[in-house]
Each structure stands twice: as structure tokens, then as C-alpha cells.
Design a protein with these regions (language model features):
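A short glycine-rich, His/Asp/Glu-containing loop-to-beta-strand
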Residues: 1-32
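Short solvent-exposed loop/turn micro-motifs enriched in small/polar/acidic residues
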Residues: 12-13, 34-36, 67-68, 77-78
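His/acidic/aromatic-lined binding-pocket segments of jelly-roll/cupin-type domains
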Residues: 19-20, 39-44, 75, 85
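A generic "binding-loop/recognition-motif" signal
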Residues: 24-26, 34-37, 81, 90
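Short beta-strand His + acidic residue motifs that chelate non-heme Fe in jelly-roll/DSBH
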Residues: 30, 51-53, 75-77, 83-88, ...
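Short acidic-glycine-tyrosine-enriched beta hairpin
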Residues: 41, 55-80
């Protein structure tokens, strides 16, 4: 349901730039980028997706619907902010920029109040819960 194409040549490049092609049902577990601190920018090139911002206990504090058709193209997430994304339209493609070098998310940066990606049923239910919070 998801495929990346990296523009950066090496994972330790100072800036990571990639296309992230995703389909509805893709689970992007809520996370943050601390230690190392990294800001992240999403620019939606096609399709539709929602970015969610969470507080420390998992309450949604903001949702941003990205849709070129509606004139909303991107979102910037500051280092340390809990965030996640739900894909709302087939064929969605996001251009993502984040400081390098690439660092896999540590357990401390995965939201403890969200289901693990390996628990598909719980992840699917969580996606539906987030979708239900959006104003249609």
C-alpha cells in the first residue's frame, strides 16, 4: 500500500527528500522526531490525505486535510510534535523533506498510545477512528 522513491543518494545525506506513494489503508503510526530533532515537510502532489497532530496522550489537537484540488498542498511538522497521516484517496503521492541523515524511529519516538503496525486489525480500526474525526 506504500512505496518510497528517494531523491537523496545516500541515507546519510544532510537532507532526505523522497516521494511517498500511498493508498487508503496505509498505516503510518503516529510518531515524532526527537534525538535527533528533525522538522518534516509534506507536500501533497496528488490525491488527498489528512495530517493529524496529537498531544502527549494521543488526543488530536489539529487535523489538516491536504488536497491540491482544494488548494491545500502541504504541512510542516516541527521536531518533537506527535503526528500521523491518513490517506484519503487512491493514488496519493507526497513529497517529503526531512533533515538527514536518516535515522530509524526509536521506540521512544513511536506513539505509545497508538497500535503497532504489526497489529493490522488494531491499525485498521485506528485509521477508521481518525477518519471519523474529519469534517466531511
Amino acid at each position: 500500500l506504500r512505496m518510497n522513491y528517494n531523491f537523496h543518494e545516500e541515507l546519510d545525506d544532510p537532507v532526505n527528500r523522497l516521494l511517498n506513494a500511498m493508498e487508503p489503508g496505509t498505516y503510518l503510526r503516529p510518531h515524532r522526531h526527537l534525538n535527533p530533532d528533525k522538522d518534516e515537510v509534506f507536500i501533497l502532489l496528488r490525491g488527498k490525505a489528512a495530517v493529524f497532530i496529537f498531544d502527549e496522550v494521543g488526543n488530536v489537537t489539529e487535523s489538516i486535510i491536504l488536497s491540491p484540488a482544494e488548494g491545500m498542498y502541504g504541512a510542516e511538522i516541527k521536531a518533537g510534535v506527535w503526528h500521523g497521516m491518513v490517506v484519503l484517496e487512491s493514488g496519493s503521492v507526497i513529497y517529503e523533506v526531512k533533515q538527514g541523515p536518516f535515522a530509524p524511529l526509536s521506540a521512544d519516538n513511536l506513539a505509545p498510545w497508538s497500535p503497532a503496525a504489526e497489529d493490522k486489525d488494531a491499525a485498521d480500526a485506528y485509521i477508521k477512528k481518525l477518519e471519523s474525526l474529519l469534517i466531511k
